Amino acid sequence: MKKIFTILLLLLTLNAQAQRQQISYIEETKYWYYVYDEQGKKIGGLSRSSVGELKGWGCDFFVAKRYSYYHICDAKGKTLKTMNVSDVGEIVGVTSTAITSKKGSWIFTWNKEGKKINARTSNQ
């Protein structure tokens, strides 16, 4: 019974990892964003009007600004976290696991879940 449970748990873990799609590239057209994986396969298309302005992407998420909010979304466009622009400032960079923003004389680093992980003063 213990072996069956272990095998089942392993299969569920592998399935969850396979479902998490990696973003390799986001193509921007006049009306659409097309998201591609590391194999060059199209994951999906998202309308620009529903997503907003693309600010950048990491390995399995992207950040878009729509109205007064930044939306952190997964590869399929599902919103994972919404953050108010007035709290975050201007997004200046997105890496595979983090987001960097600047607000006034402060630089903030956020994880891909939208949690602030660092704050420092700017050198400018």
Where do the protein language model's features map onto the residues?
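Sec-dependent N-terminal signal peptides
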Residues: 3-16
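Short, low-complexity, intrinsically disordered N-terminal segments
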Residues: 16-18, 36-37
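Short beta-strand elements that form the blades of beta-propeller/WD-repeat-like
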Residues: 20-28, 33-34, 57-66, 70-71, ...
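Beta-strand-rich domains and repeat architectures in extracellular enzymes and scaffolds
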Residues: 20-25, 42-53
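Surface-exposed loop/turn elements that mediate protein-protein interactions on large endomembrane-trafficking
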Residues: 32-48, 71-84, 109-122
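Residue-level detector of conserved, function-critical positions
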Residues: 46-63, 81-101, 117-124
